[in-house]
Every structure is written in structure tokens, then in C-alpha cells.
């Protein structure tokens, strides 16, 4: 027997639990979405030297609004509005941290837009067929350290512990000096924790 029940636990996630009953065996499968993780200032600071300053950036996923503010603080011209990425086409270069549960849709939309982009995604994205088929000519920037995202629950920041996976900056049509670039601290950027 298989049945699904909606679940909400501690406002930390949503999804469903599927319970499969078998003789002497009960298996629980949990489908969870964790998309409310915000980009810290340091994540954009680390790659700001590679983001084109002559283009208007579109921070396409609004979140709590701070990511666009961080990019503006770093000196970029940024469009950061709370609009649907799948229905709008803004700016000249997409710079964003999309909801990871929506990556296939996000990547298809990025390909459709045809704009240069810098997108933070898990390293494992590189090994997926849908990604390879859409962007065989991708370039990546490897961060100096693991990105520690800020977790929001109902609009409030909550302690989230250390991030358990690595992310890369996936870049398309930026003309980076190499296909794999290792990020370093740039001397002309002030270091700031946020």
C-alpha cells in the first residue's frame, strides 16, 4: 500500500512523505524543497572582478532583496525586482542564485534568453544531462571557500549551520580567461563579512 501525506515540520521545509508498506518493511521517502537560502555579500564579492561592469545585471530571483543590494554595493548597475523570472526578460546579464529545486526550468529559461550569466549552483549540476545538453560551452569559477548561505523561514533569518555541499559560479558568454577559474581575493576590494 502506498499513500502520501502533506507535511510541514517547524516551518523549515515542505513536501510530502510517501509511506510504502511491505511485509516486515516500511520505507519512508521524504521529498523536500529547501529554496529559501540567500546569497551572502562575500559570495558576490569573491567573483565581482569577473562580472562585466559595462552591462546592466539582472538579479533574477528576489529572495529577501539583499542579493541585488550586495551587487549594487559592489558598484554594479542592477535590476532586482520581485518579478517572475519565467515571465520577464530584464537586464543584459543574469547574475543570480536560483532556487535549486527549479534548476532544469531555470537553465532552460537561461538558454532561451541567450544572455550572458553568472549563476550559483551546486557542483553536481555539472554532471547532469540536462545541463550538459543546454550548455556544453560553460565556464566555471571555483570559489575560494564553500559559500555559507543565509537561511530564511517565513522571512526571518534562522541559524542554518554550515553548508554541506559545494557550489560553483557557472558562467556563460562572459569570455573568462580560462574555462575553470579559481577565485582569489582581489586587492582592490575591501573585505567585508555580511
Where are these regions (language model features)?
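Class I S-adenosyl-L-methionine-dependent methyltransferase catalytic core
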Residues: 1-194
Amino acid at each position: 500500500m502506498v499513500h502520501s501525506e502533506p507535511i510541514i515540520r517547524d516551518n523549515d521545509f515542505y513536501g510530502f512523505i510517501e509511506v510504502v508498506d511491505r511485509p516486515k518493511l516500511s520505507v519512508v521517502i521524504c521529498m523536500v524543497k529547501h529554496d529559501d537560502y540567500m546569497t551572502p555579500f562575500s559570495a558576490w564579492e569573491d567573483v565581482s572582478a569577473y562580472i562585466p561592469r559595462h552591462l546592466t545585471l539582472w538579479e533574477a530571483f528576489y529572495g529577501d532583496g539583499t542579493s541585488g543590494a550586495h551587487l549594487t554595493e559592489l558598484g554594479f548597475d542592477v535590476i532586482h525586482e520581485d518579478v517572475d523570472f519565467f515571465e520577464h526578460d530584464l537586464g543584459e546579464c543574469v547574475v543570480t542564485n536560483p532556487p535549486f529545486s527549479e534548476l532544469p526550468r531555470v537553465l532552460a529559461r537561461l538558454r532561451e534568453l541567450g544572455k550572458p550569466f553568472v549563476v550559483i549552483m551546486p557542483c553536481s549540476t555539472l554532471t547532469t544531462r540536462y545541463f550538459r545538453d543546454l550548455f556544453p560551452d560553460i565556464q566555471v569559477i571555483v570559489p575560494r571557500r564553500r559559500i555559507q548561505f543565509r537561511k530564511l523561514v517565513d522571512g526571518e533569518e534562522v541559524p542554518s549551520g554550515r553548508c554541506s555541499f559545494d557550489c560553483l559560479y557557472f558562467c556563460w558568454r562572459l569570455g573568462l580567461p580560462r574555462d575553470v577559474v579559481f577565485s582569489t581575493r582581489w586587492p582592490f576590494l575591501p573585505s567585508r563579512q555580511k
